[in-house]
C-alpha cells in the first residue's frame, strides 16, 4: 500500500502546475466549482480520499475502473450529484436497478468508507458527489494515468432517475451517432467522447455486453466484420452463444490494469472488445483520426483525458443552497 500511496501523492503534488483547471463554470448550472473549496472547511479531505483509494487498489485491482465508471454513470444522469449512490426508498427508485448499473456497478461500499472517514474528520462538509469526482481522479493516477485539479463544491441530490439511467448512459451496442448524441446532450463533444472512452484502458466487461459481436452483430447470424477473427475466436472460448453472461473480460487485454494508450492501439488492430469501442475507429473520420493520434501519442491522450474529465465533472452540479450534503451516501438525510 505504501508504494501505491506514495506514487499517488507524488503525482497529485504536480497538479499545482496543472493548466487544466483553476475555476470551472459548471455546465447547466449557475454555480462555480473550484479546487480549493474545502481548503478551510476540510483541509485533509483530498488526502483522506487518496489514502483510502490507494488501500482499496492494493486489495482489489479492479476498483479504480469501477470508481471511474461510477463517476461517469453519475454525471450522465441529472448531472454530477451522487444520485447513483442512493438506494431505493419510499420515494426513490434507485439508479442501481437500471440496465447499465444492475449486476455491474460496484464500489458503493468503498464510497461509504470514504464518506465515513470524512464525516469523522469534518462532519456534514464534503459531498458524496465530490467524493466520486476525487475518487475518479485518484483512480486514474494510481493506475498510471494523468492527474488534474478537481473542481469541487458539488452538493448531493435528494432524488434519483431510473429512466434517466436507462436512457441517457451510452450502451455497448449503441450506434456511433446515438452515443455522440448522448454526449452532446451533456455538453460534451466528439473529442470528449473519444478521450473519455480511453478510460476503457482499465476495467472489465461482461460477455453479455459484446456477445452479439461474436455471433449475430447485424441480425444476419454473422459476427462483426470489424472484429479481428483471431481475437473473436479467443473470446468465443469463454463467451458462448448462451450461458456465461456474467463472465468478465478485460476491456484492454494488453495492459488491463495500467492506464495507458493501449486501448487505442487495440482499436487500430480491430481488437476493441465492445462495439461502442471499435466504432470510434470504423464509423467516423474525425474519431478515427483521434484514435490514431492517441495510439501514437500517449501524452496527447493524457492531456485531453484530463480536460474532458474536468468538463464531464462540471455537468449540472447542484451548488449553493441546492441539494444537501448527505451524511450517508446511500440515502438522503431526512431518511434517518
UniProtKB/Swiss-Prot annotation:
The keyword Aminoacyl-tRNA synthetase does not apply. Residues 1-23 form the signal peptide. InterPro entries: Haem_peroxidase (IPR002016), Haem_peroxidase_sf (IPR010255), Peroxidase_pln (IPR000823), Peroxidases_heam-ligand_BS (IPR019793), Secretory_peroxidase (IPR033905). Its cofactor is heme b; Ca(2+). Coiled coil: none annotated. One of its GO terms (molecular function) is metal ion binding. One of its GO terms (biological process) is hydrogen peroxide catabolic process. This is Peroxidase 72. It comes from Arabidopsis thaliana (Mouse-ear cress).
